[in-house]
């Protein structure tokens, strides 16, 4: 009877990231990942459905998290303030301890069209979940969709900037900078009446 090896998941993740970076995602096989980690292919499949899941594991829960962050924001906050509240909460829990893994992950995804598509699908799911949560707060559908798209974009820009800086500043500080820039671009005011169309 086999026994579970301590740290197997982390070893598989590290081996996969190293191989993806060395050889490219498409040229790396599951048996190679398992061998690099000193484990069996069977052990790999106990932890991951396929090699893509090394990069995307746990992300199925992100839309629910996005919706909860919007729903849990104080009721008095407008959409831009809700975005700030949610991104501050995320920044508080994303630590710099795995920044190098996140940088490698980004490089691997950027180098593969299929992975980039998967990443875009993830962001679309986040925006959809956030838009539904904004509508549930009573935000009209157009503003809800825009707020959700802005939230996802602000998150993407902040994380990219943080990774580009190799974690020289904390993510919370970068988020604050991005939110300041966002507020300088978009005024947090009620939507004006649409202009009449020319006859």
For the regions a language model picked out, list residue spans one by one.
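Hydrophobic alpha-helical connector segments
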Residues: 64-107
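Amphipathic C-terminal alpha-helical segment
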Residues: 148-168, 184-191
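Hydrophobic alpha-helical bundle segments that form small-molecule/ligand-binding pockets
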Residues: 123-148
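C-terminal peripheral helix-coil segments that are non-catalytic and often amphipathic
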Residues: 132-135, 167-199
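Basic, helix-initiating cap at the start of DNA-binding domains
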Residues: 1-23, 27-39, 65, 173
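Small/polar (Gly/Ser/Thr/Ala-rich) solvent-exposed segments
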Residues: 119
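HTH DNA-binding helix-turn interface
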Residues: 23-25, 38, 45-57
